[in-house]
Amino acid sequence: YKRQVEEIADEISKNRLLFYVGENCPSFAEHYDRLTANCASTTPYIELTDEDDAAIYFSSGTTGFPKAILHNHESLMHAARVEQNHHGQTKEDVFLCIPPLYHTGAKMHWFGSLISGGKAVLLKGVKPEFILDTVSREKCTIVWLLVPWAQDILDAIDSGEVTLSKYELSQWRLMHIGAQPVPPSLIARWKKVFPNHKYDTNYGLSESIGPGCVHLGMDNIDKVGAIGKAGFGWKVKIVDDKGNTVKRGEVGELCVKGPGVMTCYYRDPKATAETLKDGWLFTGDMAQEDEDGFISV
């Protein structure tokens, strides 16, 4: 993003210094090596606990001004374990992450690679040929797609815009898709082109450290359209307006509970009290559970 930063460098450098890591340091920044030249080479020992504050993420602001969401270290570690568990990730896997890392959705999917010791590839660009070429060159085994990107890939194949035989895709084992409802027709179409692919999707929000608190696993492709069941290490319930659990088939508010629930809305005790109750995160999303225990929103 050097070019983009250069365009606004004068504006954003007021009352702050800009540092650069890598070769060809631009004139608007100071090189990080110069900053650290006289610093000790040993790593400072900083004792951390699971309960220590780790990160602040911001909500999308769909219901008002974006809220600052505080998470601790246990929350971030749980996100990594959830991704590793749901995708069966090992150090041999290569995960392709396309969405930007400034939100929890992309970053927590990426964390599965960090805890597994596997490689993650970050791709800027969503054209079908970019995605397929990257999967081929980097030998990606897990690819996270949004619904429009998956549709674009299938359309490009159908139109002849891309030719699958040009790419080495045999190692690609899992197509993860999410961030919005997934049409069953899309997955049926995908399986015709990629019959050996496993498929999964999930549900989450920034307050639950991103995706995974509800998960539709690789063995439940017949339930496409649902968001799934409680994810690894999570509990879920659906309640009425009085907080009582509803019966299966009835509509109520989806609530989740687990190690990934936020600590609070930063410096907003009123909003925190409205959202966190007895350890449960009230998501604000209406949902129902079918006869097999699968949840739809």
Predicted regions and their residues:
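Conserved pre-ATP/AMP-binding loop-to-beta segment of ANL
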Residues: 20, 25-27, 37-58, 65, ...
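Conserved S/T- and glycine-rich ATP-binding loop of Class I adenylate-forming
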Residues: 53, 59-62, 95, 101, ...
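Gly/Ser/Thr-rich phosphate-binding loop
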Residues: 115, 140-145, 154-222, 235
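Conserved ATP-binding/catalytic segment of the ANL
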Residues: 244-249, 253-297
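Structural core segment of the AMP-binding/adenylate-forming
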Residues: 1-34
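Conserved AMP-binding/adenylation subdomain of ANL enzymes
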Residues: 77-94, 102-142, 156-157
